[in-house]
Amino acid sequence: GTVGTGAIDPLREIAAICRENRLWFHVDGAYGAPAAALPDAPADLRALSLADSVAIDPHKWLYAPLEAGCILVRNAAALPDTFAYTPTYYAFDEGGEDPPANYYALGFQNSRGFRALKVWMGLRQAGREGYVRMIEDDCRLARALADRIAAHGELELLTHSLSIVTFRYAPPRLRTGRAEDDATLDAINEDLLQQLKAGGEAFLSNARVDGKFALRACIVNFRTELADVEAVPEIVARLGRVRKGANAANGVSRK
């Protein structure tokens, strides 16, 4: 998988290989793991339950304030077995029926802020159903954006997975597959992305898809509305036309 496109690896097949070879199966679910809670989650994503450990960034698709990262481990004893140590300057009483959690025994980091509070508050406020509804809305908006891009004559839809859509400004006459035209499209879209960042009309990032420079929309904000995504294709097309015209004036674009 890759965060660039939201692609998901064949987790069930990987889990079988790990079990057969007694390997630890870790999944980087920093962005996409929360979508496993959706009723129509992809089968590969549902296989997340087979992992020995999963990394999640709640500041991404659980809408927590930056920054908040965590790891979920199937066998909690594996962490202190790996990281715990007792230097002479530590004197904690770890006995009793309910010993305190000493986080230095659970990972490399010792001193740390109370990141868990904001995640806990979000879970208490929204609950499972609330998060499912918000994530479903994000995926619905991404589908709407992908449909509009696919129907737009000047844009090329490259990928759509979960709430991530990658595409590029690509007028048909430049979609030849020739190296020089691909280079022209890359240059147009790289410049277009900088214009978007400077103008503030929409915030997109970038990815590489089959070697092509792509614009990347990742919807992970519960405040995003349909009107926001409906505006993106024409904003991109308008800026692309201006950039293409500048290229033509300079003799860059092919006829």
Where in this protein do the model-derived segments appear?
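Conserved PLP-binding catalytic core of the aspartate aminotransferase-like
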Residues: 157-196
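Short beta-strand
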Residues: 156-161, 204-208
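PLP-dependent enzyme catalytic core of the Aspartate aminotransferase-like
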Residues: 178, 206-255
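Active-site-proximal loop/turn and secondary-structure-junction residues that shape catalytic pockets
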Residues: 2, 31-33, 60, 221
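Secondary-structure transition/capping motifs at alpha-helix termini
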Residues: 15-26, 78-80, 152-155, 239-248, ...
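Short acidic, glycine/serine/threonine-rich loops at helix termini
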Residues: 6-10, 35-40, 65-68, 83-84
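Active-site core of PLP-dependent enzymes with the aminotransferase class I/II
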Residues: 1-21
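Active-site C-terminal subdomain of aminotransferase-like
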Residues: 2, 21, 26, 46-152
